[in-house]
């Protein structure tokens, strides 16, 4: 049995003990002591000619850019929503609204660092991150190593199991026509 397996088993055992003690549950989902949390995030932005396209904090094109209030990094926006969802803290629009000029042109990295800092303060750490990009262009494969390195650096851990994959919509809808780009992110958090 590995150290991670032992830690997981101990966490599950502790969770079962807490439930069997019939402790009252706090209505704030973030305060419920569960050993693991899973969150899913999604983001989509229309694309326009010119500017630059950032994915996971990496410039992947200087031919197209997202129509967005901030820098429009769909990977980081989906990641923030996944982290917020796992903790039961709402969504990115509640925390960084596009109606607030403070976030106009903001680097999405700030959103990730702010939210993940709060997640860690609440006693959780990221174990796993899985990202799926949906885009006709640009092709993502050449950028995947840099994107993964950027995500790990942003999250402060080389040890996070992270994956980035991409697909197309086979010419269907706005994504398939190259008019938009989208990302899904799934995170698994563990109680520290």
Task: Set out the residue ranges of the language-model regions.
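C-terminal edge-of-domain segments
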Residues: 176-192
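Short acidic capping loops at alpha-helix termini that bridge into adjacent secondary structure
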Residues: 158-161
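Active-site phosphate/pyrophosphate- and oxyanion-stabilizing loops and adjacent acidic/basic residues
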Residues: 149
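Pyridoxal 5′-phosphate
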Residues: 164-168
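Mobile acidic interaction elements
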Residues: 171-173
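RNase III-family endoribonuclease catalytic core
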Residues: 32-145, 154-155
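Short, basic, low-complexity termini and linkers enriched in Ser/Thr/Gly/Pro
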Residues: 1-34, 192
């Amino acid at each position: 049995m590995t150290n991670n397996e032992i830690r997981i088993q101990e966490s599950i055992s502790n969770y079962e003990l807490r439930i069997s003690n019939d402790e009252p549950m706090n209505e704030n989902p973030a305060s419920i002591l569960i050993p693991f949390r899973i969150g899913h995030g999604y983001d989509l932005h229309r694309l326009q000619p010119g500017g630059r396209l950032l994915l996971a904090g990496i410039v992947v094109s200087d031919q197209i850019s997202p129509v967005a209030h901030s820098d429009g990094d769909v990977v980081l926006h989906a990641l923030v929503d996944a982290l917020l969802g796992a903790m039961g803290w709402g969504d990115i629009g509640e925390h960084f609204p596009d109606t607030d000029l403070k976030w106009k042109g903001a680097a999405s990295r700030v959103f990730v660092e702010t939210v993940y800092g709060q997640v860690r303060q609440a006693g959780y750490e990221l174990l796993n991150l899985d990202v799926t990009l949906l885009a006709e262009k640009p092709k993502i494969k050449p950028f995947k190593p840099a994107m993964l390195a950027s995500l790990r650096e942003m999250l402060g851990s080389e040890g996070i199991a992270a994956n980035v994959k991409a697909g197309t919509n086979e010419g269907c809808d706005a994504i398939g026509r190259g008019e938009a780009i989208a990302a899904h992110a799934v995170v698994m958090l563990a109680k520290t």
